């Protein structure tokens, strides 16, 4: 019997992958990878690119792809059997990669390549890989004595297990709560199509004649924005804000995991000779130091504060004068804000949503990308992991295949929350001269279609789709011959969001929105007067939103950037202090935000959440080139592909930016686009 995790092909046979395949596949692929490591590190193996780096990359690629596929399925098709198989193999996979990163013999081979006469003859990309690998060996503790190296390895294994458990707890806590409503009058104010969705959810659970609200965003958010019942909103807000905390079952409480992760990260930093974990985190990033990040964030906070305070005062005044609310409670904020926005700009998110059917949005987004970047996008076919999933192909103007990508767009209980792009395979030129075609995943959590109507997207959903497709284009349009530098591989973490945030700008262009809007009942495109209202409201509460993001970023930085404390016992106090300094909207006393902050405790953004704002500066300034030269100027689009999207990490991100823009980045376009200037 063949094993689809071993017999991989250009596209994986997703429905053929069973949990019983996972361990045997990893047994075989780990053994082959270990053999390859032993061969390239043997004393008689010459320290050359072709004898060490190429064969090792080829051996590791199959293992990495198989394990990534298991991780992908864990994120989109969670089940008890899959979870058991993933968790059973996580320790040995973590051990393999940690031991590889600390392998003294392999480290010595890379150093020998760098110091050899042949090094100068290598391409610039190959030289860059060697230098980066040497840096990463040092960051992994390859130069440490045996005892601290073993300790660092143990900490790394524990971190991997605890990060995954954090994510599992959050998903389980999100799924554990539902609010079943007996009387439709309790849903007063909520749009009819959302109420229909609640009825469908209840019916699917065997509760005919009732309505079920969950904590998944397509269900939770409309209730918080539109429900006139304060008691309904309070119940939902309390449940959402206390997920995976001490307010629920102990086995789903993420507090002990946060404490352990913070302790371990500080210990890892000290073992490596750094003062704190933030210093370690920033070594491969654009930002020079934690102090530089702190200065960047506090400067932005100062510039946004006046607008944020004005936004909050407007909310409170409207609540008192129009809604008879003397106090705006945490569960009132979204409802009052949406009511204020409707009153101020005379439109609702629900009204806009009727114009954005998923098929029309996809078609319009693809046509835009085709025009900007001279490619063609068409639906493809191949076995997929769920009926909701589709496969697409990107070709050049002559029809030659460039890349493929899967889309998995609807929320379901087996899928973790949020939206993301991930990669299956990365573009590269193989040793035999053939090309590996990149394959990407585009995953979202949109509302399902109801009845015979297509799925409807909010404008925020449209923006999210553009964002994730921006990541996908960065991965798929890469033309770097070395896989280690191709796509998003090796791109500085604080620059990797630049192409995604860059694409969001077209979701605010009327000519673009005309091509991707089609009213669900009439087929009419988005009217110009409605768009004008949306545009006028674009920076509605932008000060509040900016300060909220800066609150998250400063909290993340400060729990990791302290020479004297790991903040394991007082991380909530750190958050409270950041809120006192930055926030304008009071948090609920019961809020346990950190326990659901998966970005930094399970998503790779530890001491790196600032990256979103850092990359916004780059993306806003990059988009201003299109504002200056024409939004649909193919020459500007080609320059963006040539100097940024196709480059991967073959150059530093700042060099890519300078090559595209002709100068260093400016913060002014971001402040202007945000309405803060």
Language-model region placement:
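Short, glycine-/Ser/Thr-/acidic-enriched flexible segments
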Residues: 218-220, 268, 397-399, 409-413, ...
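Short pre-active-site segment immediately N-terminal to the catalytic Zn-binding motif
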Residues: 447-466
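Short His/Asp/Glu-rich catalytic/ion-coordination signatures at enzyme active sites or charged loops
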Residues: 6-21, 70-89, 112-154, 214-256, ...
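Active-site-proximal, well-structured secondary-structure segments within enzyme catalytic domains
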Residues: 125, 129, 168, 172-214, ...
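N-terminal helix-rich structural modules
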Residues: 1-191, 626
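C-terminal, non-catalytic "cap/extension" segments appended to globular domains
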Residues: 1-21, 28, 189, 197, ...
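Short, hydrophobic/amphipathic alpha-helical patches that form generic packing surfaces
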Residues: 62-72, 131, 135, 238, ...
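A non-catalytic, amphipathic alpha-helix used as a structural packing/dimerization or gating element
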Residues: 24-28, 32, 154, 158, ...
């Amino acid at each position: 019997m063949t094993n689809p995790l071993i017999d991989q092909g250009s596209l994986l046979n997703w429905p053929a992958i069973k949990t019983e395949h996972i361990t045997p596949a990893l047994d075989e692929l780990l053994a082959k990878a270990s053999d390859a490591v032993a061969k390239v590190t043997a004393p008689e193996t010459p320290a050359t690119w072709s004898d060490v780096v190429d064969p090792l990359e080829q051996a590791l690629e199959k293992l990495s792809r198989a394990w990534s596929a298991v991780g992908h399925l864990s994120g989109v098709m969670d089940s008890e059997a899959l979870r058991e198989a993933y968790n059973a193999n996580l320790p040995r996979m973590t051990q393999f990669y940690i031991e590889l990163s600390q392998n003294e013999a392999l480290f010595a081979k890379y150093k020998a390549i760098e110091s050899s006469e042949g090094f100068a003859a290598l391409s610039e990309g190959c030289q860059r890989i060697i230098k980066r690998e040497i840096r990463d060996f040092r960051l992994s503790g390859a130069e440490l004595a045996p005892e601290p190296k073993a300790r660092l390895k143990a900490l790394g294994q524990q971190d991997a297990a605890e990060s995954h458990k954090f994510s599992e707890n959050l998903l389980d806590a999100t799924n554990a709560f539902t609010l079943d409503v007996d009387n439709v009058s309790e849903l007063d104010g909520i749009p009819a199509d959302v109420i229909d969705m609640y009825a469908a959810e209840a019916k699917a659970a065997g509760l005919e004649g009732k309505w079920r609200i969950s904590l998944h965003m397509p269900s939770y958010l409309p209730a918080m924005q539109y429900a006139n019942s304060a008691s309904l909103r309070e119940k939902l807000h309390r449940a959402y804000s206390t997920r995976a905390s001490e307010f629920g079952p102990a086995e789903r409480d993420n507090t002990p995991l946060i404490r352990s992760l913070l302790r371990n990260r500080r210990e890892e930093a000290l073992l490596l000779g750094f003062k704190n974990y933030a210093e370690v985190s920033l070594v491969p990033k654009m930002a020079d130091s934690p102090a530089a990040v702190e200065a960047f964030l506090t400067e932005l906070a100062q510039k946004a504060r006046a607008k944020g305070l004005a936004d909050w005062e407007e909310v409170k005044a409207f609540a008192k004068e129009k809604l008879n609310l003397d106090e705006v409670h945490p569960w009132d904020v979204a409802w009052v804000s949406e009511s204020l926005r409707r009153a101020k700009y005379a439109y609702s998110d629900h009204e806009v949503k009727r114009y954005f059917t998923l098929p029309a949005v996809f078609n319009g987004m693809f046509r835009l990308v085709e025009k900007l970047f001279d490619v063609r996008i068409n639906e493809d076919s191949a076995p997929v992991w769920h009926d909701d999933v589709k496969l697409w192909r990107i070709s050049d103007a002559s029809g030659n295949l460039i890349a493929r990508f899967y889309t998995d767009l609807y929320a379901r209980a087996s899928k973790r929350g949020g939206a993301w792009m991930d990669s299956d395979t990365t573009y590269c030129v193989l040793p035999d001269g053939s090309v590996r075609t990149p394959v990407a995943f585009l995953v979202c959590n949109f509302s399902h279609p109801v009845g015979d109507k297509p799925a409807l997207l909010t404008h925020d959903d449209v923006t999210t789709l553009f964002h994730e497709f921006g990541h996908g284009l960065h991965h798929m349009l890469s033309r770097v011959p070395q896989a280690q530098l191709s796509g998003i591989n090796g791109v500085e973490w604080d620059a990797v969001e630049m192409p995604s945030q860059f694409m969001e700008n077209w979701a605010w262009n009327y000519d673009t929105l005309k091509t991707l809007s089609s009213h669900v009942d009439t087929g009419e495109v988005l009217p110009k007067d409605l768009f004008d209202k949306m545009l006028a409201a674009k920076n509605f509460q932008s000060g509040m939103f900016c300060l909220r993001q800066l609150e998250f970023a400063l909290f993340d930085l400060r729990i990791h950037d302290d020479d004297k404390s790991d903040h394991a016992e007082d991380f909530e106090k750190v958050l409270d202090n950041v809120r006192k300094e930055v926030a304008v909207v009071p948090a609920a006393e019961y809020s346990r935000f950190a326990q659901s902050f998966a970005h930094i405790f399970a998503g790779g953004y530890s001491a790196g959440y600032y990256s979103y704002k850092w990359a916004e500066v780059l993306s806003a300034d990059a988009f201003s080139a299109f504002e200056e030269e024409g939004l649909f100027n193919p020459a500007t689009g080609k320059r963006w592909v040539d100097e940024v999207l196709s480059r991967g990490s073959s150059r530093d991100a700042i060099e890519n930016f300078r090559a595209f823009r002709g100068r260093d980045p400016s913060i002014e376009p971001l402040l202007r686009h945000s309405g803060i200037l």
